[in-house]
């Protein structure tokens, strides 16, 4: 067979494979779309910082979340060298929005809650007084709380509820014994629930946590197929960069 014949055959084979893959994905999407979605009472959509292609940890991001169907807006919390709380995922460089500015902005928006994603706990005791100052103390909670942050959170922010961030092993996401060990870990930490990556989500996990009175928050779900897939599991919260898409699905 000469090269002139090989190339068209190779292209045709590749297109056939791609076509099969697309057909399979469309079929799975239809299956999830046709499945009835039953969400727990109080289900929420969290707009991840930087949602709707805005700048992360900006007031614009908060505004975009509010305007596109989110019940909760999320931003990252870091502290400057002198202990000022600011919105940043990494060590501050001096141009960040301050936590005070964010709380003041949120205080002007009714019914929106705030997910404060803790990146460091250096001066955590400064958060609650600012929340009181701007009358948003009953609207904030922490995520990003790793094992090593728990004691600092309890000591310096005892008034603020938090989710424990847990790296759930994908290979064990349906293993009852393993899942119960995570339940015990979350309970012992004092957290209200678990916050974890959608790739490790399972119906078994959600059900076991709910049976034990704990909340389930799943991040970060951005495409429509995964939204349907995770909604079917009935968690308490889904975090997304596309709150507009998710809110349209559940309406």
Predicted segments, located by residue:
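Phosphate-group recognition and catalysis centered on beta-loop-alpha active-site segments
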Residues: 2-251
């Amino acid at each position: 067979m000469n090269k002139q014949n090989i190339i068209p055959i190779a292209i045709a084979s590749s297109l056939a494979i791609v076509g099969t893959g697309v057909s399979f994905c469309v079929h799975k999407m239809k299956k999830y779309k046709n499945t009835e979605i039953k969400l727990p009472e109080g289900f929420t959509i969290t707009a991840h910082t930087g949602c709707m292609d805005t700048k992360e940890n900006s007031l614009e991001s908060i505004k975009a979340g509010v305007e596109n169907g989110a019940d909760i807006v999320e931003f990252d919390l870091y502290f400057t060298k002198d202990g000022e709380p600011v919105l940043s995922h990494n060590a501050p460089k001096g141009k960040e929005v301050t936590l005070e500015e964010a709380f003041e902005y949120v205080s002007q928006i009714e019914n929106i809650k705030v997910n404060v994603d803790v990146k460091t706990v250096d001066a955590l005791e400064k958060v609650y007084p600012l929340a009181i100052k701007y009358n948003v103390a009953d609207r904030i909670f922490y995520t990003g709380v790793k094992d090593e942050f728990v004691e600092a959170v309890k000591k310096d922010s005892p008034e603020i509820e938090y989710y424990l961030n847990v790296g759930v092993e994908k290979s064990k996401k349906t293993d009852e014994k393993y899942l119960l060990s995570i339940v015990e870990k979350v309970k012992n930490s004092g957290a209200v629930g678990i916050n974890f990556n959608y790739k490790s989500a399972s119906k078994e996990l959600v059900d076991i946590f709910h049976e034990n009175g704990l909340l389930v928050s799943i991040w970060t779900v951005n495409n429509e197929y995964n939204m349907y897939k995770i909604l079917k599991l009935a968690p308490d919260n889904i975090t997304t960069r596309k709150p507009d898409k998710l809110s349209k699905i559940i309406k």
